[in-house]
Amino acid sequence: MPHAFPFLTPDQKKELSDIALKIVAKGKGILAADESTGSVAKRFQSINTENTEENRRLYRQLLFTADDRAGPCIGGVIFFHETLYQKTDAGKTFPEHVKSRGWVVGIKVDKGVVPLAGTNGETTTQGLDGLYERCAQYKKDGCDFAKWRCVLKITSTTPSRLAIMENCNVLARYASICQMHGIVPIVEPEILPDGDHDLKRTQYVTEKVLAAMYKALSDHHVYLEGTLLKPNMVTAGHSCSHKYTHQEIAMATVTALRRTVPPAVPGVTFLSGGQSEEEASINLNVMNQCPLHRPWALTFSYGRALQASALKAWGGKPGNGKAAQEEFIKRALANSLACQGKYVASGDSAAAGDSLFVANHAY
């Protein structure tokens, strides 16, 4: 066993830990606004809006400038590269504006999924090349955390051992590079909801993947107190004939996390995985009411589940800005309560119950 060669000073560790704790402070979660230009195209298509840089700026400005009620609900915002360099109508860069609200600025740094040869349609994630230099630049440009998504899918033959090992190593490598630059890495090993597998199978696979990932993070000397985990909730496959209760989903999820995620990790920020807005809030709420001990904050890092109703209300029309912001604030408040186990389902919004599932989801 070789000696450790510490690559982080106590001050660097403190900075990372402070950032992570700020993002998942009580009642706070993450607004994932890091959809790629291609993903925004799909969202805008659904509201008959042209996918131009200006329309993307206007839409994200609506989210970032929602009134003070949203303030205490959001701990961090994940940006897409383009958005990082856009400005508000008042001429402030988006990162400056977001920071002025006390929200931490984050950036998606992966370059998307690519096929993994010799597997049954499995993938790995690219983007490690040049990441060291990009992190240095992003830190200068105001980013304090980052996100990297890996994708695994459940079939009778997958995820394979190769796919698990490869993706976990990529996540660990990314995490250690971020930490060298004072950036908190969010590690996202998403297990897709596609398939007809039951809840037990998802739980089993989630446990195996998370165990492998934390082993890889340890092998790469990643400082866990300065990381966050962005996992899928443990749900059955979308085509599974059996429908499980929110309580069953919460118990399966918290059990899987308790078996694999070290208590040193400050927070777990769930992805919504195509659940409806309401479902994503209810499941998060029930997890925070779960009778099992939870040593980490359980909160949200939602994209569609914070934005779907807002996007619909906006419809690409300048006059609908206020209505869109109201819908966004409604979801932000709901999830802020849910991550404290205090949410009472309302079910009043038309779009909130719509399923947001997209098969084989790629950002």
UniProtKB/Swiss-Prot annotation:
One GO biological process term is: glycolytic process
Query: Annotated site (Necessary for preference for fructose 1,6-bisphosphate over fructose 1-phosphate), which positions?
Result: 363
Recorded catalytic activity of this chain's protein: beta-D-fructose 1,6-bisphosphate = D-glyceraldehyde 3-phosphate + dihydroxyacetone phosphate
- Describe its assembly: Tetramer.
* Pfam families documented for this protein: Glycolytic
| Pathway where it operates | Carbohydrate degradation; glycolysis; D-glyceraldehyde 3-phosphate and glycerone phosphate from D-glucose: step 4/4
Report the top EC class in one word.
lyase
Q: Which family does it belong to?
A: Belongs to the class I fructose-bisphosphate aldolase family.
Q: Which GO terms describe its molecular function?
A: fructose-bisphosphate aldolase activity
CDD domains for this protein: FBP_aldolase_I_a
Name of the protein? Fructose-bisphosphate aldolase A
Q: Could you list this entry's UniProt keywords, alphabetically sorted.
A: Allergen, Glycolysis, Lyase, Schiff base
Active-site residues (renumbered):
188 (proton acceptor), 230 (schiff-base intermediate with dihydroxyacetone-p)
Q: Does the keyword Nucleotidyltransferase apply?
A: no
Remaining remarks: In vertebrates, three forms of this ubiquitous glycolytic enzyme are found, aldolase A in muscle, aldolase B in liver and aldolase C in brain.
EC assignment: 4.1.2.13
Q: Where does beta-D-fructose 1,6-bisphosphate bind?
A: 43, 272-274, 301, 304
Give the protein's function: Plays a key role in glycolysis and gluconeogenesis.
